[in-house]
């Protein structure tokens, strides 16, 4: 079974649960070092999100609305102000800054991408379907107090 895990997240997103399919996947972010604890940084009203691993310091680009999802990847809509600084997210309950990150991706599926993009534009291939997703939800769980924000980011990307 192929899941709609975007190319840039394939080495980091571990699917969890029984509900994953070609049309949606939920997973926990894990660094290549094995750590699941991250600082969360955002810019452009959470339109650009990066994670920094608390164990090894690796930066992971989680989402960039100008590059990822249908509008960013397929349409090339990049309206973001890339001069804006990143801001570190802290837990609203305890003010700590270490989180476990869960991501939910929704997709129209591979066949839709083949019909809409590959059939009409030679710049796309069949493997690109995972990058043209329609929705992303990012959930954060504070590692200090276990406070949860189930929809810290909840964005339609098409």
What are these regions (language model features)?
Residues 2-15, 24-51, 57-79, 87-131:
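Short recognition patches in nucleic-acid-associated and regulatory proteins
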Residues 84:
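Extended, positively charged loop/linker patches that create polyanion-binding surfaces
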Residues 119-158:
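Acidic, proline/glycine-rich low-complexity IDRs
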């Amino acid at each position: 079974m192929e899941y709609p895990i975007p190319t840039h997240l394939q080495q980091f997103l571990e699917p969890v649960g029984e509900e994953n399919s070609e049309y949606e996947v939920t997973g926990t972010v894990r660094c290549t070092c094995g750590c699941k604890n991250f600082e969360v940084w955002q810019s452009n009203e959470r339109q650009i999100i990066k994670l920094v691993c608390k164990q090894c310091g690796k930066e992971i680009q989680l989402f960039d609305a100008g590059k990822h999802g249908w509008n960013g990847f397929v349409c090339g809509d990049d309206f973001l102000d890339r001069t804006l600084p990143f801001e570190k997210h802290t837990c609203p309950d305890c003010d700590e800054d270490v989180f476990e990150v869960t991501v939910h991706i929704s997709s129209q599926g591979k066949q839709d991408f083949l019909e809409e993009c590959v059939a009409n534009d030679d710049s796309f291939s069949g493997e690109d379907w995972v990058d043209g997703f329609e929705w992303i939800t990012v959930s954060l769980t504070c590692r200090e107090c276990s406070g949860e924000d189930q929809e810290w980011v909840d964005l339609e990307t098409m």
